[in-house]
């Protein structure tokens, strides 16, 4: 296994690090909030008295978006995030590293079996707050979520943008950010992905979002795009 020759902060993305390896390869990483613990079998690196977790571009759509040049990484230390579709917590664990011990990630997942796996991650990472719930019904968990700085959404639903906007109306601060992974094939298998992206983006615009960037996630995820937007509360 190739050895580390340097780890340095990413020049563009807050809370993200570049790992340079002996074989010339370069990896993305986050500083491990819980040293010694892995979440999904990722490689751990030690450098300068700190531990870093490799951020797998093929396992995390946010990592893929960063690798493909997303305009900005808006998540900051201490932020509160609403995560819709947290699954087993791969991406959420890296966001957990970035927001740190003073941040909070309200993590909504619909599938009980998947949530059971996520709870094991949240037991170790105290800034993750598991919520077994349906992202289509934000009213049902409104008593569990505070106003948040940002929403991260990765939900396989036909009306992804509308669901996110409904949640934003409840929980997202004015000028709060959205990172939405659009899964074209989850919305309509009969239409071209570009048509789906355009439709979902138009929905976001109609609901008060200003689109800052849209990045396609190939080769890491086929027929996916990451939308980065800001919300203007009415």
From Swiss-Prot:
A matching Pfam family: Fibrillarin
GO molecular function: histone H2AQ104 methyltransferase activity; RNA binding; rRNA methyltransferase activity
GO biological process: box C/D sno(s)RNA 3'-end processing; tRNA processing
EC identifiers of the protein: 2.1.1.-
Alphabetical list of InterPro entries matching this protein: Fibrillarin (IPR000692), Fibrillarin_CS (IPR020813), SAM-dependent_MTases_sf (IPR029063)
Enzyme type, top EC level: transferase
Keywords from the named record: Methyltransferase, RNA-binding, rRNA processing, Transferase, tRNA processing
SMART domains: Fibrillarin
SUPFAM superfamilies: S-adenosyl-L-methionine-dependent methyltransferases (SSF53335)
Binding positions for S-adenosyl-L-methionine per the UniProt entry: 90-91, 109-110, 134-135, 154-157
Quaternary data: Interacts with nop5. Component of box C/D small ribonucleoprotein (sRNP) particles that contain rpl7ae, FlpA and nop5, plus a guide RNA.
Family indicated by similarity: Belongs to the methyltransferase superfamily. Fibrillarin family.
Functional description taken from the UniProt entry: Involved in pre-rRNA and tRNA processing. Utilizes the methyl donor S-adenosyl-L-methionine to catalyze the site-specific 2'-hydroxyl methylation of ribose moieties in rRNA and tRNA. Site specificity is provided by a guide RNA that base pairs with the substrate. Methylation occurs at a characteristic distance from the sequence involved in base pairing with the guide RNA.
The protein's name: Fibrillarin-like rRNA/tRNA 2'-O-methyltransferase
Source species of the chain: Staphylothermus marinus (strain ATCC 43588 / DSM 3639 / JCM 9404 / F1)
Gene that this polypeptide is encoded by: flpA
């Amino acid at each position: 296994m190739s050895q580390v020759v340097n780890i340095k902060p990413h020049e563009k993305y807050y809370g993200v690090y570049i790992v340079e390896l002996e074989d010339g390869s370069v990896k993305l990483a986050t500083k491990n909030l819980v040293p010694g613990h892995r979440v999904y079998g990722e490689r751990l690196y030690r450098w300068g008295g700190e531990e870093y977790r490799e951020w797998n571009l093929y396992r995390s759509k946010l990592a893929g978006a960063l690798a493909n040049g997303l305009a900005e990484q808006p998540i900051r230390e201490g932020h509160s995030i609403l995560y819709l579709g947290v699954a087993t917590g791969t991406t959420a664990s890296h966001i957990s590293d970035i927001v740190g011990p003073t941040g909070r990630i309200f993590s909504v997942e619909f599938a009980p079996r998947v949530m059971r796996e996520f709870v094991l991650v949240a037991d170790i990472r105290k800034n993750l707050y598991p919520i077994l719930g349906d992202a289509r019904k934000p009213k049902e968990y409104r008593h569990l979520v505070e106003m948040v700085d940002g929403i991260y959404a990765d939900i396989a639903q036909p009306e992804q943008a509308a669901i996110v906007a409904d949640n934003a109306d409840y929980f997202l601060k004015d000028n709060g950010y959205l990172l939405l992974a659009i899964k074209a094939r989850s919305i309509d298998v009969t239409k071209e992905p570009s048509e789906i992206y355009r439709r979902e983006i138009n929905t976001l615009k109609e609901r008060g979002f200003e689109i800052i960037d849209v990045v396609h996630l190939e080769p890491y995820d086929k027929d996916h795009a990451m939308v980065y937007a800001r919300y203007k509360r009415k």
